[in-house]
Regions:
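A metal-dependent, Asp-based hydrolase signature
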Residues: 1-27, 45
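Functional surface patches built around histidine and acidic residues
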Residues: 8-9, 26-31, 70, 89-90, ...
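Short, conserved alpha-helical segments within structured domains
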Residues: 17-21, 38, 86-87
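Long amphipathic N-terminal alpha/beta scaffold segment
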Residues: 23, 28-39
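Asp-based, Mg2+/Mn2+-dependent phosphohydrolase catalytic module
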Residues: 40, 44-47, 51-52, 60-165
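Conserved SAM-binding loop
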Residues: 57
């Protein structure tokens, strides 16, 4: 956060300001992870049906790994992948790493920009589950399937996955 401040601010980064920014960052990092209602039960259902679940998220690896650990949801996932950017190349890389068959692999997410559209571009099927708290930077038009047989589902709630998978 201090580096970002230095890049974006005209104000000089003093020792006092650096200390305040670090204290703020520690409060953010320690904030409890808020789980959307029904997510643990839905993940349990999917894992119980022998679906191979891989969590792919973007951001700082240490921060994202900590969030996953603190969420209590890590046990539902066969793997957790933290990438710098969720784009078609990243989805291809993860699919290759885990030898995923794109004809039967689904991406589930709330962001057209970072989840649905790049997954479709990478040849995966996609499920779009909109959420009110999705960052505005993640908004864009939903793409369309790119190949024959590819599917895009839109569900109202994460828990609706249990009716489809």
């Amino acid at each position: 956060m201090c580096n970002t401040f230095e890049c974006l601010s005209v104000e000089r980064l003093t020792d006092e300001l650096r200390s305040r920014i670090r204290a703020f960052a520690l409060r953010i990092a320690a904030h409890p992870v808020e789980i959307i209602a029904g997510v643990p039960e839905t993940l349990q259902h999917l894992a119980g049906r022998s679906h191979h679940l891989i969590l792919m998220t973007k951001g700082n690896p240490a921060e994202q790994t900590s969030k996953v650990e603190r969420s209590g949801l890590k046990g539902y996932f066969a793997a957790v992948e933290v990438v710098a950017e969720k784009n078609a190349k990243a989805y291809h890389t993860v699919a290759e790493k885990y030898a995923l068959d794109t004809d039967v692999t689904w991406m589930i997410g709330n962001s057209p920009r970072s989840d649905v559209n790049p997954a479709l571009e990478a040849g995966l099927h996609a499920v779009f589950v909109p959420h009110d708290m999705t960052w505005v930077l993640e908004h864009e038009e939903l793409g369309a399937p790119k190949k024959a047989g590819q599917r895009l589902l839109r569900l109202d709630r994460f828990t609706d996955l249990t009716s489809h998978f």
